[in-house]
Amino acid sequence: MELSKGNFIAKFDDDDLYGPNYIADQLLPFEYTDADIVGKLCTFMYHEKSAKTYLRFPKNRHKYGDLVLGPTFFFKREVSENVKMRDLSKGEDTNFLKDCLNAGYKIYATDPYNFVYMRKKVEGFHTWDATDEQLLSNTIALGSENPESYAFV
């Protein structure tokens, strides 16, 4: 982050899908909220094992809170100047958000669009070893079409 330039910093994950309007979409909440960090909690998820797309946490959009998904972090440069990401192999995203909240920064969950959380069926592929029960709780099954057809606007 020290080498970055500009007023905002975004965190991406190379195994998830980001739509062509993702960055513009994530910048919008900074115009109508007083959030310091934005991201997505309500997300589209492609579950490879079931070959279906789901909407996760459908009620968790357009609201302040204490959690957004790590691969969707988008924050003001000032945040990274005052709160450092811990050097951990697991839990760095959650701890970063906790540290930001403790420092007085506000977190805002945006809409689910322009991002797809890709959940592979290969064991050990993901840092978070979640069960299917954990992944599919609080979801709405959408269908087996290409996940981009639901998510990208």
Question: What are the functions of these language-model segments?
Answer:
Residues V38, F44-M45, K52-F75:
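A recurrent flexible, glycine/aromatic-enriched loop bordering the glycosyltransferase active site
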Residues I9:
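Short aromatic/hydrophobic "clamp" motif used to bind/position activated sugar donors
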Residues Y105, M118-E145:
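Nucleotide-sugar-dependent glycosyltransferase catalytic core
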Residues M1-E2, L97-K98:
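Short, conserved alpha-helix that lines the donor NDP-sugar binding/gating region
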Residues D13-L17:
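The conserved acidic donor/metal-binding loop of glycosyltransferases
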Residues N21-K52:
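Conserved donor NDP-sugar-binding/catalytic core segment of glycosyltransferases
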Residues L41, I107-F115:
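Catalytic beta-strand/loop signature of glycosyltransferases that borders the donor
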Residues K90-F96, Y105:
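Acidic donor-binding loop at a coil-to-helix junction in glycosyltransferase catalytic cores
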